Amino acid sequence: MPTKTSAGRGAKAAPSAGATLRPAPLSRPAPADLVAEALALDRRLAAIDSLEDRLVEITRSVPGRVTFSTSLGIEDQAVLNAIAASGAQIDVFTLDTGRHFPETLDTLEASENRYGLNIRVMFPDAREVEELVARDGIYGFRLAVENRKACCDIRKVRPLKRALQGAAGWVTGLRREQSAGRAHMPFASWDAADGLVKLNPIADWSLEQLEAYVAANNVPVNPLHARGFPSIGCQPCTRAIKPGEDIRAGRWWWENEDGKECGLHNRPRQKEAAA
């Protein structure tokens, strides 16, 4: 089984003929051919049933480094299991905001032990966190949406951008069922914000399908999921949901329900090239 580290990868399997995606420089808009190639990969992934086979197709189609960001929630644990099972050459990293539940950190350790992986841990800049807390207070993110978004930006978005530097593909564990904003999410799209291909190999999975996969493969799962936490983020910003509530109702519960995102997955993505 290959060891996932923060170091660059060796040579990848040869891509399918005519199916290679070519990353564009980060400072330029996505040319029309890159958008078209991402759409073609999206169609190929939709025709594949197995998660493991989808991951292999991703590594065949996307040249250069492919990386997977895990929040250590149940969706990401399923993808992590499939990466290990398939031997797909995909780096793995997670964001430690400094405010995780202890159970989340326990899941990180259990996952590394189970799969023999070295999961790269990305931290926010300490000085930026100090300045944020000095300005807004330790719980200032509850006073205004702008404060909360600033906190997410420093603790999550900026470390994410550092982790994605130099990557050609970014794998996530997002599912369409998770929120209205993700209902039409593709398997693959050109990510204009980061200059790479964004890949969602379990986009079409139902919760029942996800839970069945996890049970069948004895995947390590964050115990908070069994305590009413379908979506798990930072401890001060996450609560258990009540019966009948949306699965993301426990995230930033003091805010309006519309468009509650941390900024990791709601930036501009696939765009048409300028005429």
Regions found by a protein language model. Give the residues of each.
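Nucleotide-activated chemistry modules centered on ATP-dependent adenylation/adenylyltransferase
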Residues: 2-275
